[in-house]
Design a protein with these regions (language model features):
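Extended acidic/polar, glycine-enriched regions
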Residues: 13-45
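Active-site region of the double-stranded beta-helix
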Residues: 5-6, 23-26, 33-36, 49-146, ...
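Conserved SET/PR-domain catalytic core that frames the SAM/AdoMet-binding pocket
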Residues: 10-16, 145-156
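Single conserved hydrophobic/aromatic residue that forms the stacking wall/gate
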Residues: 1-12
């Protein structure tokens, strides 16, 4: 019954459920993670989704984040965080300064596994997912196309979209021991937290 109302945003379902598509076609993202308890289903209306915009064209970091399962649902979703991220304008960096969340060592960092699914506009656009597992050692990159999916369980992981294209990615974060995300920013680039407008407000939303 939750999926019958018009103007539906998103639905948080129990572990055991049946979903029936009533149209000829649809696109559905299913996000989940390991949790020890069964939780009740609830509806997330579009008007309830917390949105934050930060960065700037000058710093090539301008983007918008929609927190589908954000701080407002802290007590309802175990250790799950779900977001939509958009570059604002064409080209630019995301997930910058380089950061990671692969080790539980509070207050500096939490262990959160993450999955990205990417889309581009126009659809023939592309980007690059950068991965660096150790400081001061060479990393590597994955070229991203429309529909690419990346699973991240360790390392620094900024990404970039090519000039002339907009990038969207659906993100799923699951905490190992807690829901609130604590990101560790790479020391050599962390000073740029002071140069990117609004980034500290963005970081504070991952609760």
């Amino acid at each position: 019954d939750l999926v019958r109302s018009r103007g539906l945003g998103d639905v948080y379902k129990r572990q055991e459920c049946t979903i029936t598509c009533l149209s000829d076609s649809t696109e559905c993202f299913i996000a989940g993670g390991i949790y020890e308890k069964k939780l009740e289903a609830f509806l997330v209306q579009k008007k309830e989704i917390d949105t934050v915009q930060y960065g700037s064209d000058d710093t090539k970091t301008h983007r918008k984040i929609k927190h589908i399962l954000g701080a407002k649902h802290h007590e309802q979703v175990g250790r799950l965080l779900v977001n939509e991220l958009y570059t604002v304008g064409a080209g630019g960096w995301s997930g910058f300064p380089p950061h990671k969340h692969d080790t539980n060592r509070l207050p500096d960092e939490t262990r959160h596994d993450e999955v990205y699914n990417y889309r581009f506009r126009p659809g023939h656009g592309f980007g690059v997912q950068v991965m660096q597992y150790e400081d001061d050692k060479e990393g590597f990159g994955y070229q991203l196309f429309n529909g690419s999916t990346i699973a991240i369980d360790k390392g620094y992981h900024p990404c970039v979209v090519a000039p002339g294209y907009e990038m969207y990615y659906f993100t799923i974060l699951v905490g190992l021991s807690q829901r609130s995300l604590v990101q560790y920013f790479q020391k050599t680039h962390a000073y740029q937290l002071e140069t990117i407008p609004g980034i500290k407000d963005m970081i504070a939303k991952y609760k």
